[in-house]
């Protein structure tokens, strides 16, 4: 199978070669204009499937600013040409936390309650509906952006201080109940043989450094700080996590694959923090993310993962044209 890897990174910074050794593949670092370049790739006839890992790109150099693009442009171009591609489609590409929360509530899936707020005054009113402790995050909270140890607030004064900081930097803040307890990840992937019944990988538990209880900028990107993941092997907990992840994946209508971040309180109740329809994959061993670990927990590893998402890409291509 001939695979085109669509990325916004250069091969020096992101090299999927160790994972794709069983395929004939080429990596294309996309720059704008995206639609024209994807059309040219399609018309070349060189590829059978497109492995899309683009997150969008903004060039810092003003001279290259016109080369930047939004990641949704890549998906839109792939869909417009009805090409077989992996990952999220335009229906579920970048949902807000509030959209996730609404869908979870409507489907009886536990979700960390919260609000998007745009000012200290708004936060002061809405915080009355939340239970402490409270976490103040970037409104989209990707990559732990803008999160620090002080992002956990135990008093109203702390909440308002953090809301002011985050809103001033990002224009809004996600203010939500912090679930004291353990944190887990659940990876759910399309089952091409039964698209309504996705496959769920063995979940992972996050093992935080001593004195830490959640991911934040100071520890997430410092590879000198000991941080680990552990496969969940307790049968009952494993089944509960897989079931909640699967239900959230289905309720959100995720295509391809998605990673749920889940907290468990002292009562054993599960609360999803988010479902990421574009989780990082194929990272280098020293930088493995949760999706990499969970894929490798499975006996078929990345071979099984690629088999599922490539077959799903063709299946969804047929569904779009039906």
What does each model-found stretch correspond to?
Residues 154-236, 240-243, 264-271:
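Phosphate-binding site of ATP-dependent enzymes
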Residues 11, 55-57, 139-141:
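Short glycine-rich anion-binding loops that position phosphate/pyrophosphate groups of nucleotides
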Residues 234-322:
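ATP-dependent carboxylate activation and anion-phosphoryl transfer catalytic cores
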């Amino acid at each position: 199978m001939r695979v085109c890897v669509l990325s916004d990174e250069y091969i020096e910074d992101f090299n999927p070669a160790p994972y794709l050794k069983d395929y004939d593949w080429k990596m294309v670092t996309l720059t704008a204009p995206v639609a024209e370049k994807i059309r040219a790739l399609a018309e070349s006839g060189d590829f059978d499937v497109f492995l899309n890992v683009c997150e969008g790109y903004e060039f810092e150099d003003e001279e290259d600013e016109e080369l930047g693009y939004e990641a949704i442009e890549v998906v839109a171009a792939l869909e417009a040409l009805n090409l077989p591609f992996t990952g999220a489609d335009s229906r579920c590409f970048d949902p807000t936390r509030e959209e996730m929360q609404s869908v979870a509530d409507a489907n009886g899936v536990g979700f960390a309650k919260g609000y998007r707020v745009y000012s200290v005054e708004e936060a002061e009113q809405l915080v009355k509906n939340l239970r402490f402790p409270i976490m103040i995050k970037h409104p989209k909270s990707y990559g732990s952006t803008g999160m620090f140890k002080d992002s956990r607030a135990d008093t109203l004064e702390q909440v308002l201080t953090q809301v002011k900081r985050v809103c001033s930097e990002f224009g809004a803040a996600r203010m939500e109940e912090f679930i004291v307890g353990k944190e887990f990840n659940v990876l759910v992937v399309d089952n091409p043989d039964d698209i309504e019944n996705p496959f769920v990988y063995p979940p992972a538990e996050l093992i935080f450094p001593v004195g830490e209880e959640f991911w934040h900028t100071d520890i997430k990107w410092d590879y000198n700080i000991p941080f680990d993941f552990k496969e969940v092997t307790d049968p009952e907990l494993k089944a509960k996590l897989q079931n909640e992840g699967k239900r959230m994946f289905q309720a959100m209508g995720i295509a391809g694959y998605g990673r749920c971040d889940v907290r468990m309180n002292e009562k054993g109740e599960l609360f999803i923090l988010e479902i990421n329809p574009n989780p990082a994959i194929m990272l280098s061993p020293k930088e493995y993310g949760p999706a990499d670990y969970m894929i490798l927990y499975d006996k078929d590893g990345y071979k099984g993962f690629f088999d599922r998402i490539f077959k799903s890409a063709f299946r969804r291509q047929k569904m779009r044209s039906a």
